[in-house]
UniProtKB/Swiss-Prot annotation:
Species in which this protein is naturally found: Shewanella oneidensis (strain ATCC 700550 / JCM 31522 / CIP 106686 / LMG 19005 / NCIMB 14063 / MR-1)
Positions that bind shikimate: 21-23, 68, 93, 109, 228
Pfam family, one: SDH_C
Binding positions (NADP(+)): 133-137, 157-162, 226, 250
UniProt pathway: Metabolic intermediate biosynthesis; chorismate biosynthesis; chorismate from D-erythrose 4-phosphate and phosphoenolpyruvate: step 4/7
Segments crossing the lipid bilayer: none
UniProt EC number: 1.1.1.25
Protein name as it appears in the record: Shikimate dehydrogenase (NADP(+))
Gene3D superfamilies: Leucine Dehydrogenase, chain A, domain 1, NAD(P)-binding Rossmann-like Domain
């Protein structure tokens, strides 16, 4: 009698570089927590060979994939269908191979951000929010923030025209229902304190800071940096020096977006708290 092994679904994350990725660890933990049978690997795709690598993965049994820099826009172009978040972001971080062989693209970055913010703050309803940066990371978070009920979303960027372009795009959605909540300002035009300041730029990775005025930070301001590390980021250190009430890094967003991807593939959303704690401990050990 021949015993056949059950087929285990394959998932992966594609990037270049990819060795630093925490995704295999995160999804491995999610699989264990939910008792889902799957494998998840990191794949280093050649800069000029992402499409071929992805097609090879899917043709050899891959069911879904995450995509990180620099391939999110290329992945977007390969999709047969898109979620609303992905369509507006112009980039995808999650690919699903559907039963008919087509590829669906999602962008779970903003959903992961909002989930992490709510876990810390309880609600985003009516908050005055400043979003620093107007690149892909910012663009993927605007709709989830608006859907979470923020009262005002001001977008600021070194190049103000990019911030204005984003405001113009999102102001036209749903017959203009978000128009009164959105505003683009240069960094020198920012006035008054914000309840929440989100840094979507990668400046902290180089130990740099966007040229923001100190006046945006008040004694109740919460600051969030999408970057993360074993030590507080440069942006969060600056925020604390200005008197911010609380600072949060992007590790929870990383785990949160992964949980949303996992749920799209497996129809079960894992608990993020346990995995976030493990990942935080792992970061400390790697110092």
């Amino acid at each position: 009698m021949t015993v056949t092994s059950p087929i285990v679904d394959r998932y992966a994350v594609f990037g270049h570089p990819i060795g630093h990725s925490k995704s295999p660890f995160i999804h491995g933990q999610f699989a264990a927590l939910t008792q889902e049978s799957l494998t998840y690997e990191a794949i280093l795709a050649p800069i000029d060979g992402f499409e071929a690598s992805l097609k090879s993965f899917f043709s050899s049994g891959g069911k879904g994939a995450n995509v990180t820099v620099p391939f999110k826009e290329q992945a977007f172009a390969l999709c047969d269908s898109l979620s609303a978040e992905a369509a507006l972001a112009g980039a995808v971080n999650t690919l699903s191979l559907l039963a008919d062989g087509s590829i669906r693209g999602d962008n779970t970055d903003g959903l992961g951000l909002v989930a992490d913010l709510i876990s810390h703050l309880g609600s985003l309803q009516h908050k005055r929010v400043l979003l620093v940066g107007a690149g892909g990371a910012a663009r993927g978070c605007i709709l989830p923030l608006l859907n979470a009920g923020v009262g005002q979303l001001v977008i600021t960027n070194r190049t103000q025209t990019k911030a204005k372009d984003l405001v113009d795009i999102f102001s036209q959605l749903e017959e203009g229902i978000y128009k009164d909540k959105l505003q683009a300002l240069s960094m020198s035009e920012l006035t008054g304190e914000f309840e929440l300041v989100i840094n979507s730029t990668s400046a902290s990775l180089a130990g740099e800071l966007p040229p923001l005025p100190q006046s945006i930070i008040g004694s109740t301001t919460v600051c969030y940096d999408m970057m993360y590390g074993a030590m507080p980021t440069a942006f969060n250190q600056w925020a604390l020096q200005q008197g911010a009430a609380k600072v949060i890094d992007g590790l929870g967003m990383l785990v949160g977006q992964a949980a949303k991807s996992f749920a799209l593939w497996r129809t079960v959303e894992p608990d993020t708290a346990v995995v976030l704690k493990l990942l935080r401990e792992k970061l400390q050990l790697d110092i």
